[in-house]
UniProtKB/Swiss-Prot annotation:
Entry comment on modification after translation: Undergoes proteolytic cleavage following delivery to the lysosomes.
GO molecular function: ceramide binding; phosphatidylinositol bisphosphate binding
Recorded GO CC terms: cell projection; early endosome; endosome; late endosome membrane; lysosomal membrane; lysosome; multivesicular body membrane; multivesicular body, internal vesicle
Key words of the record: Cell membrane, Cell projection, Endosome, Lysosome, Membrane, Transmembrane, Transmembrane helix, Transport, Ubl conjugation
Protein family per UniProt: Belongs to the LAPTM4/LAPTM5 transporter family.
Protein known as: Lysosomal-associated transmembrane protein 4B
Superkingdom of source: Eukaryota
Length: 226
């Protein structure tokens, strides 16, 4: 008996560095988990000691607040949610539970859509980049150097940078999606196609042999009345 799984023909089971999509998804989930854990630690330390991350109006070059307590709490909640989503994706890929990967995949789609909107905004409104740079504080690193660049060249550089990011994010999305399909296909027993041979065919004797053997039997003894 030979089993053929059709879901193995329509997509690749390998990603970068020739590793399996499950391994790639686990590594990606752990990487996002570490990043969000570091961000959460920074936010918690900033919330515990506001003076350590406090910037005065002279340092910022304007009369606005860097981050208040409400925004800090929102950022902490988002970091906790991201840690939960990344942990679910890592656990789902490790334990081969496809449903646990869906939240992380939805986050990837949402992040890709936001970056696409940024690229469209830069392409449609190229002057918005110069306006955004002018609003930065005067002591912002490399502000004057960026302002001195030709606006057209600056737009092209930013679009090229965003295109590279979108390509990389799209590749990561495909890796996670292939991992979901792989796990979902392995857990579905009804998608397997069973290929069998004729080894179980029942061979019946020829009709002539059956009738001859039946006729050759001795007749029953005669009936004797009492």
């Amino acid at each position: 008996m030979k089993m053929v799984a059709p879901w193995t023909r329509f997509y690749s089971n390998s990603c970068c560095l020739c590793c399996h999509v499950r391994t790639g998804t686990i590594l990606l989930g752990v990487w996002y988990l570490i990043i969000n854990a570091v961000v959460l630690l920074i936010l918690l330390s900033a919330l515990a000691d506001p003076d350590q991350y406090h910037f005065s109006s002279s340092e910022l070059g304007g009369d606005f607040e860097f981050m208040d307590d409400a925004n800090m709490c929102i950022a902490i909640a988002i970091s906790l949610l991201m840690i939960l989503i990344c942990a679910m994706a890592t656990y789902g890929a490790y334990k081969q539970r496809a449903a646990w990967i869906i939240p992380f995949f939805c986050y990837q789609i949402f992040d890709f859509a936001l970056n696409t909107l940024v690229a469209i905004t830069v392409l449609v409104y190229p002057n918005s980049i110069q306006e955004y740079i002018r609003q930065l504080p005067p002591n912002f690193p490399y502000r004057d150097d960026v302002m001195s660049v030709n606006p057209t060249c600056l737009v092209l550089i930013i679009l090229l940078f965003i295109s590279i990011i979108l390509t990389f994010k799209g590749y990561l999305i495909s890796c996670v999606w292939n991992c979901y399909r792989y796990i979902n296909g392995r857990n579905s027993s009804d998608v397997l196609v069973y290929v069998t041979s004729n080894d179980t065919t029942v061979l019946l004797p020829p009709y002539d042999d059956a009738t001859v053997n039946g006729a050759a039997k001795e007749p029953p003894p005669p009936y004797v009345s009492a």
